[in-house]
Amino acid sequence: MLKYPDYISKLISFLKKLPGIGFKSAEKIAFELLEWDPSQIEAMALALQEFSTSHATCSNCFCLKISQTSPCNFCSESRDSSSLCIVATPKDVFALEKSKIFKGHYFVLGNLLSPITGKHLSLEKLAILKQRIEACSPKEMIIALDATLEGDATALFLKQEFSYLPIKISRLALGMPVGLSFDFVDANTLARAFSGRNCF
């Protein structure tokens, strides 16, 4: 059986690591890149290199830094410190920012509890979250997680973990279809879900 040259096989193997990209899609992308001008490929390689060395997260909220200011833009005093929104990924922060409904602070968990795979939350991040809540005393903690089994399990865990604090704990409701990830929810739907959040 005839095999692809190593440089194509290697590229396909890397592309397959991306979510939603199987062998056929990776193969298609690899052969599309063969048609690109070498300068475009070099520019892409440079962008990937810059991406790997330049991205940074805030040590306070774990959001992606969009500038070198400290605290980060999402932790600045210009935002409403009375509400803290818990999300799973830095991408979720930008999704909520597009909805223009939330002006408070964020905290990025990084991953969700998974009853199926046994995945746990980061103990280090939980400790930082506790310190932040106890130090800043927000009035409301909004759990903005995917409406999935993992999101439900994580939300329940957080509710139990912080039930000793005099803080309102709410979760996004109206407009968030069950089983759907933030990635597939538009800004208007997120805004409605935020407005319709319930005590949890």
From Swiss-Prot:
SUPFAM superfamilies: Recombination protein RecR. The keyword DNA damage applies. Residues 82-177 form the Toprim domain. GO terms for molecular function: DNA binding; zinc ion binding. InterPro entries: DNA_Rcmb_RecR, Rcmb_RecR, Rcmb_RecR_Znf, TOPRIM_dom, TOPRIM_RecR. May play a role in DNA repair. It seems to be involved in an RecBC-independent recombinational process of DNA repair. It may act with RecF and RecO. Belongs to the RecR family. HAMAP family: RecR. NCBIfam families: recR. This is Recombination protein RecR.
